[in-house]
Amino acid sequence: MARVTVEDCIDKVENRFELVLLASHRARLISQGASITIDRDNDKNPVVALREIADETLSPDDLKEDLIHSLQKHVEVDEPEPDPASMIAAGGVAAADGEEQDDVPETITFDQMSEEELLAGIEGLVPPEKSDDY
């Protein structure tokens, strides 16, 4: 990588570590087929990514947001929590209607399994096929 390119990027992204993260993420996107916003000039993907950041054809904030989303494994959806007052009112209405609430067991019971049944179940398991991942 050209030192000039990195020094041009420091003006846009002050932290060198963050610059490396953003440029490497952008280089991976380019290698996966994302369109580039500048002329390639026979440069490799990391250099193209740095030149895009230096020329401000991509916003560092947008790259950072995209990097964060790519690293998230579980995206939490904000759902409104039920209002406790409405739940109490709904429970009170159901009890007032005379519905029997005997359907709900008071204690939770689990299936009991003997040691022999457990061992037979374990012996019946099929081991997964080996892959080249590890």
From Swiss-Prot:
Query: What class does this enzyme belong to in the EC scheme?
Result: transferase
Per its record, the protein catalyses: RNA(n) + a ribonucleoside 5'-triphosphate = RNA(n+1) + diphosphate
Q: Which GO terms describe its biological process?
A: DNA-templated transcription
Q: Where does the record locate the signal sequence feature?
A: none
Q: Which GO terms describe its molecular function?
A: DNA binding; DNA-directed RNA polymerase activity
An example GO CC term for this entry is: DNA-directed RNA polymerase complex
Q: Which NCBIfam families match?
A: rpoZ (TIGR00690)
Which named protein is this?
A: DNA-directed RNA polymerase subunit omega
Which gene carries the instructions for this protein? Answer: rpoZ
